[in-house]
Amino acid sequence: MTSNRILQLEDLLKREISQIILSKVKDDRFKSFNIIDVKVASDLSSAKVYFSIINGNESDVPEIKFLEKFSSMIRSQVASEVVLKKVPKLKFVYDNTLYEANSIDDLLKSLNE
């Protein structure tokens, strides 16, 4: 698959996963997820879904067993919403970039005071 098509698939998955979390997920642990990026493997067998926690930090990230159960539920929802030959297996990966950036920003503000 061409890289342009992979980029389109990544964008589609990002939008669909975000929409599913907003509209269909009942578990409050996942309502604060902010999907940052999706990276699909070149063979389309898997995708890493990078997320952050809105107004949270790493201690707010659900345990791996919940993330695995969550990813299979989201994958089946994506399969029912989007016409794809094969929906990649999803792996949710916590991205703490925003949290780290806020920490650095707070540190810089405290130095200026």
Q: What spans do the regions from the language model cover?
A:
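Charge-rich, low-complexity N-terminal segments
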Residues: M1-S46, S52-E113
